[in-house]
Amino acid sequence: MAWGKLLNAGQTCIAPDYLLVQEEVKEEFLSLLAKEFDHLLGKNPQEQKHFVRIVSDRAFARLSGYLQYGTIYYGGKMDAKERFFSPTLLTDVDAASPVMQEEIFGPIFPVIPFSELSEAAEFVTKREKPLALYYFGVDG
C-alpha cells in the first residue's frame, strides 16, 4: 500500500485514493504504515531526490486544501517553492468532503475506519467506480 501511494508521489491514475481499515486494527495499522513510509523515504522525505514533486502549482494548491478535511496523523509537510508534499495520512475524514469526492492524485491517504466488512463494501459501492481497487485481508 505504501509503495502504491508513493509511486510518483501518488500522481498516477491507479494510486489508491483512500484506505478502509477495520476499526479494531486502525491504530496499529496507521503506526505500521507510518513506519513503512519512513522506511521507504527516511525521516525527511524532502531530502530524497527520488521522491518526485507535485506536477504543478495548481495541483499543489489543490492538495494543500485537502488537508483541512481531516486530522493529520502523519506527514502534512509541504514546501510550495519546491512543490514538495510529504506522504500524509488523514484520519477523521468526512466521506462527503472534497478529499473523498475527487481523485486525489497526490500523496494524501485518507483512512476511513469500518466495523463490519459489509459496511466497507457498502461504502465502496455507493461511490463512483474507481479505476482500481485493492483488497488486502485474511480472506483474499
Predicted regions located by residue number:
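ALDH superfamily catalytic-core signature
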Residues: 1-94, 113-118, 122-123
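Conserved C-terminal structural/oligomerization subdomain of aldehyde/semialdehyde dehydrogenase
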Residues: 84-140
